[in-house]
Amino acid sequence: MNKKIIIFGGTGGLGSQLVSKLGAEGYTVKGLSSKDVDVTDYAQVEGVMQEHIPDIVINLAGANADSFLHKLSDTNNREAARKVMKVNTVGVVNVVAAALPHMRSNQYGRIILTSSVLTKKPVMGTGVYGSSKTFIKGLVMTCGLENASKNVTCNALQLGYFDGGLTHKIPDKVKTVIKDSIPAGRWGTIDELYNTVKFLIDTPYCNGTSIEVDGGIQ
């Protein structure tokens, strides 16, 4: 196989498990945390790309800070929201921009980003985070369009609530309400995340789209 993968956000609950499962498939996988590379700093991201020359880039890195929009008049809330937007938009653009040159040159590349179920079913207090994930849906459409002729695909995973990742930070009472709202009646699993990632790697005709992996939430 000999394909090299970089996973930004690859040391968290979901990321570390995805690193292990892809590694077991024969890929050479490097999982990076925010301490390893600041995705909002293009020079750092470009340095990682030049060092590893990945065939496949997966971005799980993200920031979240819930706040009602009317409370963004508070300086601290506004600063937290600014960080969310910077990591989830500028950071993602940096990852994509730094990955594309060598992928286009090699005539092979897979870029997989992460969006959110909040783009279709918003929750109060998540306006900034949800908006940042809506940005991802538009980005992959253009990226796929621009790079398909070079055998480079760009897609997004529009994720629901998984057993791991940000879900563990949700208060228990809220978790119960959320789980009851999921038609599947449960959290997503790492196997389901892995299977979707593997599908996107193996299916170049799937390009410029966001795949809903959310247990049927409408």
Regions found by a protein language model. Name each.
Residues 11, 15-20:
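N-terminal Rossmann NAD(P)H-binding glycine-rich loop of SDR-like oxidoreductase domains
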Residues 64-82, 125-128, 168-170:
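Conserved mid-core segment of classical short-chain dehydrogenase/reductases
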Residues 96, 132:
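Active-site helix of classical SDR
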Residues 101, 145-146:
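Alpha-helical segment proximal to the catalytic Tyr-Lys
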Residues 116:
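Residue(s) in the substrate-gating loop at a strand-loop-helix junction
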Residues 148-153, 206-208:
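Short, small/polar-rich loop/turn modules that mediate ligand/substrate recognition or access, typified
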Residues 186-213:
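C-terminal substrate-recognition "lid" of short-chain dehydrogenase/reductases
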